[in-house]
A protein has these predicted regions:
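Short glycine-rich anion-binding loops that position phosphate/pyrophosphate groups of nucleotides
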Residues: 24-26, 48-50, 98
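Conserved acidic residues
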Residues: 17, 40, 90
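Short amphipathic alpha-helical segments
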Residues: 31-34, 54-58, 105-106
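NTP-dependent small-molecule kinase module
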Residues: 80-119
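Generic detection of well-ordered alpha-helical segments
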Residues: 2-9, 13, 50, 73, ...
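ATP-dependent small-molecule kinase phosphotransfer cores
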Residues: 1-37, 85
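A glycine- and Lys/Arg-enriched "phosphate-lid" helix/loop adjacent to the NTP-binding pocket
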Residues: 38-83
């Protein structure tokens, strides 16, 4: 987690207007998560546990399913445990059961609105 924080600090300093995709577990380190909240426009791309699992499998990563028969229950617990942290994001967008194009259009509109940019 220390390396994640250092990478985030560096990214914020060097690229103040960049889009930074962080790992979901970043919220487990309060200092790193607070750094993100203080310096960035934050977006929670929320998805159902089923969609999370499908997306991981679609990337060819079957480890979550192979490691445990209770993988879905584990994923639900992880997401529920992080939800209070994720909800601190300025923007929240549910990406479940949405085509990519519609999700992107919604995301673009929400971010431009938050940054007070013309749509």
């Amino acid at each position: 987690r220390r390396y994640e924080r250092r990478a985030l600090e560096e990214a914020i300093q060097i690229y103040p207007e960049a889009v930074i995709a962080t790992p979901g577990g970043l919220v487990s380190d309060a200092a790193t998560f607070n750094l993100l909240l203080a310096h960035c426009t934050t977006v929670w791309l929320r998805a159902s546990p089923g969609d999370h699992m499908q997306r991981v499998a679609a990337q060819g990563d079957v480890r979550p399913m192979a490691a445990s028969r209770e993988a879905m229950d584990d994923l639900k617990r992880i997401l529920a445990g992080r939800a209070a942290f994720y909800s601190k994001a300025e923007i929240e967008l549910d990406t479940s059961v949405k085509p990519l194009e519609a999700t992107f259009a919604d995301l673009r509109a929400k971010v431009r609105g938050a940054l007070r940019l013309p749509l």
